[in-house]
Amino acid sequence: MSSQIDAVILAGGMARRMGGDDKGLVELNGEAMIKHTIDRIKPQVKEILINANRNQTRYAEFGFKVISDEHTGFLGPLAGMITAMGQTDADYLLVVPCDCPLLPTDLVPRMLAAIKAEDAEIAVASDGEYEQPVVLLLKPSLRDSMKAFLEAGERKVDFWYAKHHFVVESFSDQPNAFVNVNTPEQKQRLAMEITK
Ligand SMILES: Nc1nc2c(ncn2[C@@H]2O[C@H](COP(=O)(O)OP(=O)(O)OP(=O)(O)O)[C@@H](O)[C@H]2O)c(=O)[nH]1
Ligand SMILES: [Mg+2]
């Protein structure tokens, strides 16, 4: 039987570098940033959860369930993952950020194959050089481990997965796949690239 995969799109941060504008909702080439991410991910998973801590009504307009961090206080991406892991019955949860509009269209099959080949618990994407700590495929049963880690005051996703059996899947064949839009300047630059 094939594995069921759900996804959470993380849009729960404060987006300080974007000047406080909600990063998932800023417009990139006529569409909300998160819509680009949704379009990349939707064909690859069963259900999508959108993790947001403000503008929840606006996020709901994309047609997916919106979930807010169960640990309040903007504790970082782990808080969004923990919440999503508690709300899925899938075999694996794909975690992606809302601000990577060019994610690979073959992200899930490659991450899943990497996990299965090594009987690992987690796959982490890499651009060939750097690991992408918020682009993960993981087993929802890891929730208790992640929750304990967060509640011990830890915040770094890569420190958490280092405690588990993880594999790195490289997407060096797709140099722009993890282009990350954190500032208005980066958004401008990407908009010009896309329309070229
Ligand atoms: N649920 C949740 N997600 C978060 C939180 N902080 C960051 N994220 C998400 O984690 C991903 C990576 O974080 P950043 O790129 O630093 O985003 P950010 O923290 O909103 O932006 P900055 O304030 O500029 O650092 C983004 O998809 C964020 O939405 C948080 O407190 N809760
Ligand atoms: Mg941040």
From Swiss-Prot:
Source organism: Shewanella baltica (strain OS155 / ATCC BAA-1091)
Q: Output the InterPro entries linked to this UniProt entry.
A: MobA-like_NTP_Trfase, Molybde_CF_guanTrfase, Nucleotide-diphossugar_trans
Report residues binding GTP: L10, A11, G12, K23, N51, D69, D99
What cofactor is this protein dependent on?
Answer: Mg(2+)
Report the locations given in the UniProt record: Cytoplasm
Q: Which GO terms describe its cellular component?
A: cytoplasm
Task: Name one process (GO BP) from the record.
Answer: bis(molybdopterin guanine dinucleotide)molybdenum biosynthetic process
**What is said about its interaction partners and assembly?**
Monomer.
Q: Which Pfam families match?
A: NTP_transf_3
| Its EC number(s) | 2.7.7.77
Where are the membrane-spanning stretches?
none
> Which SUPFAM superfamilies does this UniProt record tie to the protein?
Nucleotide-diphospho-sugar transferases
Task: Please give the function described in this protein's UniProt entry.
Answer: Transfers a GMP moiety from GTP to Mo-molybdopterin (Mo-MPT) cofactor (Moco or molybdenum cofactor) to form Mo-molybdopterin guanine dinucleotide (Mo-MGD) cofactor.
Q: Where does Mg(2+) bind?
A: D99
Q: What family classification does the UniProt entry report for this protein?
A: Belongs to the MobA family.
What are the protein's GO molecular function terms?
A: GTP binding; metal ion binding; molybdenum cofactor guanylyltransferase activity
Query: Keywords in UniProt for this one?
Result: Cytoplasm, GTP-binding, Magnesium, Metal-binding, Molybdenum cofactor biosynthesis, Nucleotide-binding, Transferase
Could you identify this protein by its name?
Answer: Molybdenum cofactor guanylyltransferase
What is recorded about the protein's domains? The N-terminal domain determines nucleotide recognition and specific binding, while the C-terminal domain determines the specific binding to the target protein.
Reactions performed catalytically: Mo-molybdopterin + GTP + H(+) = Mo-molybdopterin guanine dinucleotide + diphosphate
